[in-house]
Amino acid sequence: MIEANHDRLSGALDGVRVLDVAEPLGVLVSRILGDLGADVIKIEPPGGDPSRNLSPFVTLEEERLSLPFVRANVNKRSVILDLDRRDDQQRFRALAEQSDIVVSTEGIAAWAARGIDLDRLSIFYPHLVWLSFSTFGLLGPYSSYTGNNIVAEAMGGLSYIQGDDAKPPCVSPCEQGVYLASIQAAFGALMALWERRSSGQGQLVEASVHEVLANLYFLLVNYGLWSDIPYRIGASNFMPPNGYYPCKDGYVFIAALMPHLWEKLVDVVGDPRLQDEALRDAEYRNEHPERVDPILREFTARFDRWTLMETLQRHGVPAAPWSTVADVASNAHLNERGFFIEFEQPLFGKLRNAGPMFRATASPLRIRRPAPQPGEHQQEVLAEAVSQVKREPLPAVAGARRGLPLAGVRVLDLSRAWAGPYGTRYLADFGADVIKVESAQFADPREPGNPGYGEVNRNKRPITLNFQTAEGRELLKRLVAISDVVVENFSPRVMAKYEID
């Protein structure tokens, strides 16, 4: 692949302005939009954003820097406004008139007290996408409740399935619930922004951490079909081999659920006890883990974790070593791909951090500016508020009616199993024509009768192609040619094998 000169390329949201009034729950939402190229203006209260006080800190003489704050607030400019004062409310409204998206974590009453009626945004701010991001949403019996990541994970059912069944539930580390919901919220704002291209109008978008987490892991669909309430499996293996196995210096994770992966693992281990025909059945292995796990533990205990990972991967078995944070920071693969980035943080010098969440060759995500000091950009932003004209609604496309934002977009879905189909389902839910291509030779491990299959493949049109024939490959190329988006989760060599590079 030819590497582009990223310094000369614009971001996907170049020219889009975002007002960030999302302290501290929603700061990652606007960070995502900033990474995509948007001009994000962070509105901080007098005294600064409370998330500046989140530990851990880097301390230099009398100054201290919150690392979580830096992580969530690069690519932003900072302005101090007291939104309880009338003059600053007017300044905020002037900025809103010149912005495309507002990201807020406060409710209807708080904004009404400041003279902004969220029910009448389309009248006073017809161009604006207003994203409300909160624990429980704008309306409903819990909408006024105080919430955070732990509260949302408990209420959304995520904590219930985490941990050991004999012990209390566990919360996920590093506020994963809020992180996941932030990605969903940013996606919602992008969908509204895309819809504005045809309708010319903005809209109010709600994203609730509670609802995002309640939508995970097929919990509701399984309960709706079978009244199934899962138990917490802790570190035990579900459908072995699928879990951590001990090594000389730690653990390795092995995931060989599908039949061809099981066969490869059996060949590598070379133990005749695993060659029993009954063990080819994943359900049987799940019911009799004592016939699998002890043998695998004997095998894995002979190796160090990195050697075992390389051995298994060389034979096509998915495996990864248990990694400490130090292991991740020194990981050869991440470093060679340039995943880690360094940027200059005022007062503290050079910081090393994780890079953007995905790569785009023509509109790369990148760090354009460090996390700001409180009010660092006060004068320039307020001067822009005076000098710039307010943004008007865009002219609507002739004959366009408001509807699903991705209507008219065609997506060719070649992905299998979980991650790919789940992603394309979101595109289908928002109106894209998603054509799901399956192969008779390599059936999706989630069978059509499985509720998980239906959950990730709703709103799609399925077809079957035989990629092993010239006719099948030609049909695949024709489908690629008439699609706007192609999604696949094959290993890197597969698409080239089908003559699509």
PLM features: residue spans?
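Short, well-structured beta-strand/strand-turn elements
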Residues: V40, Q313-D327, Q388-K390, V434
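Aromatic-enriched alpha-helical interface/lid elements that frame and gate functional surfaces
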Residues: P240-H315, A319, A326, G399-R402
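Glycine-rich beta-alpha junction loops
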Residues: G47, T135-G137, V209-A214, D249-Y251, ...
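A glycine-rich dinucleotide-binding beta-alpha-beta segment and adjacent secondary-structure elements
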Residues: H315-R368
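N-terminal helix-loop segment corresponding to the beta1-alpha1 unit
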Residues: M1-S198, Q373, H377-D501
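Conserved Rossmann-fold dehydrogenase catalytic segment
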Residues: L138, K167-Q176, R197-E211, Y231-N237, ...
